Amino acid sequence: MLTITSYFGFLLAALTITSALLIGLNKIRLI
């Protein structure tokens, strides 16, 4: 149970960081 929770937490963090980087790159390109 604990491993599944930590896995989902890590996956959520990875998705958040990836989306943040993509949004940042798009903003830099637009400027």
UniProtKB/Swiss-Prot annotation:
Q: Which domain of life is it from?
A: Eukaryota
The alphabetized UniProt keywords are: Chloroplast, Electron transport, Membrane, Photosynthesis, Plastid, Thylakoid, Transmembrane, Transmembrane helix, Transport
GO molecular function terms attached to this record = electron transporter, transferring electrons within cytochrome b6/f complex of photosystem II activity
Cellular compartments annotated: Plastid, Chloroplast thylakoid membrane
What Pfam families does the annotation carry? PetL (PF05115)
Q: What is the protein's membrane topology class?
A: Single-pass membrane protein
- Annotated GO biological process: photosynthesis
Give the residue spans that cross the bilayer: 4-26
Oligomer status and interactors: The 4 large subunits of the cytochrome b6-f complex are cytochrome b6, subunit IV (17 kDa polypeptide, PetD), cytochrome f and the Rieske protein, while the 4 small subunits are PetG, PetL, PetM and PetN. The complex functions as a dimer.
Function comment: Component of the cytochrome b6-f complex, which mediates electron transfer between photosystem II (PSII) and photosystem I (PSI), cyclic electron flow around PSI, and state transitions. PetL is important for photoautotrophic growth as well as for electron transfer efficiency and stability of the cytochrome b6-f complex.
Looking up PANTHER family in the UniProt record yields: CYTOCHROME B6-F COMPLEX SUBUNIT 6
Task: Tell me the protein family, please.
Answer: Belongs to the PetL family.
Name under which the protein is recorded? Cytochrome b6-f complex subunit 6
Species of provenance: Amborella trichopoda
